[in-house]
Swiss-Prot record:
GO biological process: 'de novo' UMP biosynthetic process
Lineage: Archaea, Methanobacteriati, Thermoplasmatota, Thermoplasmata, Thermoplasmatales
Cofactor(s) the record lists: [2Fe-2S] cluster; FAD
Full protein name: Probable dihydroorotate dehydrogenase B (NAD(+)), electron transfer subunit
Family of the protein in this entry: Belongs to the PyrK family.
Gene3D superfamilies in the cross-refs: Dihydroorotate dehydrogenase, electron transfer subunit, Nucleotide-binding domain of ferredoxin-NADP reductase (FNR) module, Translation factors
Organism expressing this protein natively: Thermoplasma acidophilum (strain ATCC 25905 / DSM 1728 / JCM 9062 / NBRC 15155 / AMRC-C165)
Keyword Flavoprotein applies: yes
NCBIfam families linked: PRK00054.1-1
Pfam families listed in its UniProt record: DHODB_Fe-S_bind
Length: 250
């Protein structure tokens, strides 16, 4: 367990903040750490910046993430890891597809040969659009307040997917599922970063399992071929209490 001091914060959008800090550990793009706040709990988080300084971009969901949103320089938290496999990055032109705060996990693989499709519910919830030149940026919003009016999988019909050597995707699981189906129909090469309920991060509790695959050990990044016939991906998941719930695919 490593004690981390926040050096700098940057607000990305309402209820979204990046915490920058120093940590002398190598982290591969796509790997995650377990973030612990004493008295509140522990959650998995991917890094949005893996160089120096490192950074974690947080969206307020629960009590731990809300407490992190409220942090200022000098505040402390604890992390262990890194865990997981990370992205298999290849040279050549690539497309990253980020839904909501999921785009944060994809930032470390973006380079000058990267196009980005960034989506959110509304214009106000879009983040990191300033990281990409206009010629390489595509935007989609659920309500049409910015860019394409619709969802990422619908926008893909407008792109020539064949120009991309590989596509990398991160976001809410219903969005990942639809994008996976679309890319599979296009015979595209793609990797997906999954987020599931996670207690241990090291393969003991099995709460993060998706169709027999442990997200913490065999993921969180999976190749499209591992997911296209997975019986649970995009269908159901286990909550922190162990209850199985079905995802809203509307």
């Amino acid at each position: 367990m490593n004690r981390i001091t926040v050096d700098q914060v940057r607000d990305e959008a309402k209820n979204v903040r990046t915490l920058f800090f120093r940590w002398d550990h190598d982290v591969k793009p796509g790997q995650f750490v377990m973030v612990w706040l004493p008295g509140l709990g522990e959650i998995p988080m991917s890094l949005s910046y893996v160089g120096s300084p490192k950074g974690i971009t947080v969206k307020a969901y629960g009590k731990v993430s809300q407490a992190m949103i409220d942090m200022e320089p000098g505040h402390e938290f604890y992390i262990r890891g890194p865990y997981g496999n990370g992205f298999q990055i290849e040279s050549g032109r690539k497309l990253i597809i980020g839904g909501g705060s999921g785009i944060a996990s994809l930032l470390p693989i973006a380079d000058s040969d990267t196009d980005a499709l960034i989506s959110a519910k509304t214009k106000e919830e879009l983040i990191f659009t300033d990281r990409f030149p206009e010629s390489r940026l595509f935007i989609a919003t659920d309500d049409g307040s910015e860019g394409f009016h619709g969802f990422p999988h619908e926008f893909l019909d407008r792109l020539d997917i064949s120009v991309y050597r590989k596509i990398y995707v991160c976001g809410p699981e219903p969005m990942l599922y639809r994008v996976m189906q679309k890319l599979a129909s296009m015979n595209a090469r793609a990797e997906f970063s999954l987020e599931r309920t996670m207690k241990c991060g090291i393969g003991i509790c099995d709460s993060c399992s998706v169709g027999g695959l442990q997200v913490c050990r065999q993921g969180p990044v999976f190749d499209i071929e591992q997911l296209r016939n997975n019986p649970e991906f995009g269908i159901s998941r286990t909550t922190y209490s162990g209850k199985r719930v079905y995802l809203n695919m509307k």
